[in-house]
């Protein structure tokens, strides 16, 4: 597959090829590279409440909130648990004075609801990435979130799809 870089600088990125995620590395500025699909080397380990690659080790609680993101290269914990869990989905009442959806009151944090109703969690594998897909319900809304780790890239992606049916409630993902 031919991958074009429209930027004026070299870049590396993930691309989808035949339904699988591949890594296109060092594509020249305003140039192209040929990318061949690569099968997973199995270096990403996903278990019920953890995921790990050569860069990060993630640990989740029973509601799939992050309890730990350990950076293996820096040899340090990324999250400060004294301030809360990571990727904790929170809903807040939202009754603005003038402009619905444009104005958040400064007292919105007074009514917080945790989105902890996990209906399903499963390991997912997609080419050069793997992770955990979590389905949550909140009242009549559904949130599907996949947390991805990559074989050759030092990043964590939080891919989130929200079917939000609530009125006067806002949703956020909190990280300490």
Residue spans of the language-model regions?
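Catalytic and substrate-binding regions of extracellular carbohydrate-active enzymes
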Residues: 1-173
């Amino acid at each position: 597959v031919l991958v074009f870089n429209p930027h004026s600088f070299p870049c590396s990125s993930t691309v989808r090829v035949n339904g699988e995620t591949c890594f296109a590395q060092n594509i020249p500025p305003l140039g192209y590279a040929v990318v061949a699909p690569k099968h997973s080397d199995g270096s990403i380990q996903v278990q019920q409440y953890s995921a790990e690659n050569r860069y990060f080790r993630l640990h989740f609680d029973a509601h799939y909130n992050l309890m730990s993101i350990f950076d293996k290269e820096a040899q340090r914990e990324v999250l400060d648990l004294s301030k809360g869990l990571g990727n904790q989905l929170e809903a807040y009442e939202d009754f603005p004075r003038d402009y619905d959806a444009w104005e958040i009151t400064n007292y919105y944090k007074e009514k917080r609801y945790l989105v902890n109703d996990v209906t399903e969690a499963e390991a997912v594998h997609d080419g050069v990435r793997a992770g955990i897909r979590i389905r949550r319900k909140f009242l009549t809304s559904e949130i599907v979130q996949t947390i991805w780790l990559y074989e050759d890239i030092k990043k964590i992606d939080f891919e989130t799809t929200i079917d939000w049916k609530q009125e006067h409630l806002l949703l956020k993902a909190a990280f300490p």
